[in-house]
Amino acid sequence: MVAVIIKGNEVAEKKRAQLKEEVVKLKEQGIVPGLAVILVGEDPASRSYVKGKEKGCEQVGIYSELIEFPETITEERLLTEIDRLNGDDRINGILVQLPLPKHIEEKAIIERISPEKDVDGFHPISVGRMMTGQDTFLPCTPHGIVELVKETNLDISGKHVVVIGRSNIVGKPVGQLFLNENATVTYCHSKTQNMKELTKLADILIVAVGRPKMVTADYIKEGAVVIDVGVNRLETGKLCGDVDFDNVLDVAGYITPVPKGVGPMTITMLLHNTVESAKRAGVVCK
């Protein structure tokens, strides 16, 4: 058996086409979704991510605003800018590109964003609402992962999901989202002693650790859905995931590639959250 490859780029394009239709309908009502992205400094990777977000906004018809600051900006000045955007009716989503310079406390910046405009889903209020199953903006990568699993038409309810990784960005929240879908969830991490025993029980395995090709066929239950969140660059310059793709291909039932797997879904879910925020706000642009 060779696994079915879940092509995240194709799923993302399909969802963006749906979002584009929604944006057209909103604009007919005088509502234009708007996203503000704050970029601090000149980090090439951050700038590349921001370009991807701008391109996504343009693709679906979202108004986007890029606000750039030098690396020397004070925390106070950055907080003042967030306050301004919180009060700007044209802006439905605020995103601060991480990481920030060391002299700026990321926690303070994230918590200053209004929960109504927290399209990244990182604000503690958003996290709390997610934990209790309330309606909120879900964190983009975890939400994208759940959507990819749903593409397999597998009934998540009652399935055993194993998550390798416990970061606040992916590992912890993705487990919670699957729990909200009535799955049984197990977390594995660097202190887990019997990892392979646990992962071989997984109907759905999520790998998000940042270790190239760590997960091999002997971690996988036959027919499992394997979602590879890792993006690692080898010495050859080639990108690879946390899963040894070729090794696992003959055991898994479904698998995401790297690249063109989880990555395209992250920005797509950001666009989704921005459109949802605009719907909730319902502010007609003049």
Swiss-Prot record:
Its EC number is 1.5.1.5, 3.5.4.9. NADP(+) binds at G165, R166, S167, S190, V231. It comes from the Bacteria. Pathway: One-carbon metabolism; tetrahydrofolate interconversion. GO terms for biological process: L-histidine biosynthetic process; methionine biosynthetic process; purine nucleotide biosynthetic process; tetrahydrofolate interconversion. The keyword Glycosyltransferase does not apply. InterPro entries: Aminoacid_DH-like_N_sf (IPR046346), NAD(P)-bd_dom_sf (IPR036291), THF_DH/CycHdrlase (IPR000672), THF_DH/CycHdrlase_cat_dom (IPR020630), THF_DH/CycHdrlase_CS (IPR020867), THF_DH/CycHdrlase_NAD-bd_dom (IPR020631). GO terms for molecular function: methenyltetrahydrofolate cyclohydrolase activity; methylenetetrahydrofolate dehydrogenase (NADP+) activity. It holds the Pfam family THF_DHG_CYH_C. It catalyses: (6R)-5,10-methylene-5,6,7,8-tetrahydrofolate + NADP(+) = (6R)-5,10-methenyltetrahydrofolate + NADPH; (6R)-5,10-methenyltetrahydrofolate + H2O = (6R)-10-formyltetrahydrofolate + H(+). One of its GO terms (cellular component) is cytosol. The keyword Zinc-finger does not apply. CDD domains: NAD_bind_m-THF_DH_Cyclohyd. Keywords: Amino-acid biosynthesis, Histidine biosynthesis, Hydrolase, Methionine biosynthesis, Multifunctional enzyme, NADP, One-carbon metabolism, Oxidoreductase, Purine biosynthesis. PANTHER family: C-1-TETRAHYDROFOLATE SYNTHASE, CYTOPLASMIC (PTHR48099:SF5), C-1-TETRAHYDROFOLATE SYNTHASE, CYTOPLASMIC-RELATED (PTHR48099). Homodimer. Belongs to the tetrahydrofolate dehydrogenase/cyclohydrolase family. Catalyzes the oxidation of 5,10-methylenetetrahydrofolate to 5,10-methenyltetrahydrofolate and then the hydrolysis of 5,10-methenyltetrahydrofolate to 10-formyltetrahydrofolate. This is Bifunctional protein FolD. It comes from Bacillus cereus (strain ZK / E33L).
